[in-house]
């Protein structure tokens, strides 16, 4: 784990962490990472839904709508995993939010 390299830094607060604290840190870091995947999938859902709205041809709308359903399944899977298996869902990263807001 890259954070363990801080053990050698003089005065580092992580120098006193025991194994349980490192496990807690790893779980929270994983939860934060998966939360960003969830928000990314929510952004993809939004983008594909807008595509359905934007294209003028009915066949293109049908095709794009299948992608909307796929993205909705991804959102559902990540949300369920975070709710059932992880300790928290973190808010969207400001940089990711900025990208999604530009769409």
What are these regions (language model features)?
Residues 1-103:
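Non-heme di-metal
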């Amino acid at each position: 784990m890259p954070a363990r390299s801080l053990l050698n830094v003089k005065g580092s607060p992580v120098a006193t962490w025991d194994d349980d604290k490192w496990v807690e840190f790893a779980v929270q870091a994983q939860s934060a990472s998966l939360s960003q995947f969830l928000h990314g999938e929510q952004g993809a859902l939004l983008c594909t839904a807008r595509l359905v709205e934007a294209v003028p041809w009915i066949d293109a709308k049908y095709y794009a709508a299948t992608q909307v359903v796929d993205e909705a399944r991804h959102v559902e899977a990540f949300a369920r995993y975070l709710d059932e298996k992880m300790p928290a869902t973190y808010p969207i990263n400001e940089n990711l939010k900025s990208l999604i807001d530009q769409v």
